[in-house]
C-alpha cells in the first residue's frame, strides 16, 4: 500500500480504539460520552469486598441481574466483553467451580481446533469478546489497581453518534510548517 493508505489506516485504527475506550470508559465530560462503566443505574455484581477470582456463581449472578431488568432487547447480541487477563482466568474455569479437575470447561474456544473457524468463543452459552479497553487496573477494597471488569449485555443497544462521511484527513498548510520541515495531519471520524 501507498503511504497515504498507511497513514489513513493508522489514523482509522487509532480513532476506532478511542471510540471503543469512550464507549466503555468515557467520562461524560470534555466532549466524551458517558461510557458503560460510568453509567449509573446499570447492574453490577461484585466478586468480593476486595475483589476475587471469577466463579460460575458470579457469572450466573451477572447474567441474572441483567436479564431480570429486560437487558436483552436482541438476545442474539448478548455478549461478554472483558480483557485478556480475565480471558485467561475464564479459560481455566470449570463447571465444578474450580480451575483444576472439576467438570467441563465453561469457556469454549475450540475455534475448530485453532483453525480459527467454526465455533465462536462462548462462556456459559454467550459469546465472549476480548478487548484491552476493558480495565484491568481497577481498585476494590484493599486490592488496589489489580482488579478487572467483565461487561455483559446486549451490545446492539450501545449507540454512539458520529457525523460526517467517514474519516476526514486535513493536512496542515501553515507556511511555518514548511519552513520547519513539519507536516501536521488531523483525522476526524
Where are these regions (language model features)?
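Structured, hydrophobic secondary-structure cores that serve as assembly/anchoring elements
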Residues: 1-189
Amino acid at each position: 500500500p501507498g503511504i497515504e493508505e498507511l497513514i489513513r489506516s493508522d489514523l482509522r485504527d487509532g480513532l476506532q480504539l478511542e471510540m471503543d475506550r469512550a464507549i466503555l470508559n468515557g467520562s461524560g465530560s470534555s466532549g466524551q460520552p458517558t461510557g458503560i462503566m460510568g453509567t449509573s443505574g446499570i447492574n453490577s455484581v461484585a466478586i468480593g469486598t476486595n475483589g476475587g477470582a471469577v466463579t460460575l456463581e458470579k457469572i450466573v449472578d451477572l447474567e441474572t441481574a441483567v436479564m431480570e431488568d429486560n437487558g436483552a432487547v436482541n438476545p442474539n447480541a448478548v455478549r461478554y466483553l472483558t480483557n485478556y487477563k480475565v480471558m485467561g482466568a475464564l479459560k481455566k474455569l470449570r463447571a465444578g467451580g474450580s480451575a483444576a479437575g472439576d467438570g467441563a470447561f465453561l469457556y469454549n474456544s475450540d475455534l475448530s481446533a485453532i483453525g480459527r473457524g467454526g465455533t465462536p468463543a462462548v462462556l456459559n452459552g454467550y459469546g465472549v469478546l476480548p478487548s484491552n479497553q476493558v480495565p484491568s487496573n481497577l481498585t476494590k477494597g484493599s486490592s488496589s489497581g489489580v482488579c478487572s471488569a467483565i461487561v455483559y449485555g446486549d451490545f446492539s443497544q450501545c449507540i454512539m453518534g458520529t457525523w460526517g462521511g467517514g474519516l476526514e484527513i486535513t493536512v496542515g498548510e501553515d507556511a511555518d510548517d514548511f519552513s520547519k520541515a513539519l507536516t501536521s495531519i488531523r483525522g476526524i471520524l
